[in-house]
């Protein structure tokens, strides 16, 4: 808010001088800058979602209606938690192959295979519901990245948990293999974009 107030103060100061004719133009530009941001961001999300959807369809043979429906959710959750949307899309490919109804033997559910008994308190709502599931999976991944300090280790944590990774060499190797698989899916998707 400082900038517009300061800007308009300067304009009013010079309104009777040779800067006066520019006041209207400056007001229009400033207004567009502040009101246009939301439409630019929404167009950006729409364009990025469309591009991601096309890539998911090509790279992973996902049906167009599924890719179109999930891509905006992936972009929005990735933006919210500062995760690369291509990485998130690759995690979904690894976890569920874009099938929402998947339930693992361990009880993990949905697209990102979240285990409700561990995450229900942190991620309220129905974790089978696509948006809730993607948002929760993204939150978990971002949290693990902060804890691990790098994405490959965060991916390993996502698969076997930090405790499993740090306490058991077999689990650590399993997590590292998982991270490599996700990174391979990420590479394939990047090539399709």
Predicted regions and their residues:
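Export/targeting segments at the very N-terminus of extracytoplasmic proteins
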Residues: 38-96
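Sec-dependent bacterial lipoprotein signal peptides
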Residues: 3, 7-35
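Sec/Tat-exported extracytoplasmic proteins
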Residues: 59-63, 77-82, 92-102, 115-118, ...
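Extracytoplasmic/secreted proteins, especially bacterial periplasmic and envelope-associated proteins
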Residues: 51, 69, 73-76, 86-87, ...
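Acidic helix/loop microenvironments that form the catalytic cleft of cell-wall polysaccharide enzymes
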Residues: 96, 150-178
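A short, structured beta-strand-centered segment in the mid-to-C-terminal lobe
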Residues: 124-133
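Substrate-binding/active-site groove segments that recognize
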Residues: 104-122, 137
């Amino acid at each position: 808010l400082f900038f517009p107030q300061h800007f308009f103060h300067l304009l009013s100061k010079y309104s009777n001088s040779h800067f006066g004719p520019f006041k209207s133009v400056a007001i229009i530009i400033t207004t567009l800058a502040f009101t246009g941001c939301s439409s630019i961001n929404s167009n950006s999300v729409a364009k990025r979602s469309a591009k991601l959807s096309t890539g998911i369809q090509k790279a992973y043979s996902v049906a167009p209606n599924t890719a179109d429906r999930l891509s905006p959710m992936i972009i929005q959750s990735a933006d919210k938690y500062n995760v690369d949307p291509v990485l998130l899309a690759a995690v979904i490919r690894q976890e569920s192959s874009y099938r929402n109804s998947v339930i693992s033997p361990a009880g993990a559910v949905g697209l990102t295979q979240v285990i409700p008994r561990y995450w229900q308190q942190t991620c309220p709502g129905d974790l089978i519901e696509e948006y809730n599931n993607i948002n929760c999976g993204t939150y978990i991944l971002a949290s693990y990245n902060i804890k691990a300090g790098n994405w490959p280790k965060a991916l390993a944590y996502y698969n076997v948990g930090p405790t499993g990774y740090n306490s058991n060499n077999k689990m650590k190797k399993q997590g590292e293999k998982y991270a490599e698989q996700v990174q391979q899916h990420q590479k394939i998707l990047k090539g399709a974009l």
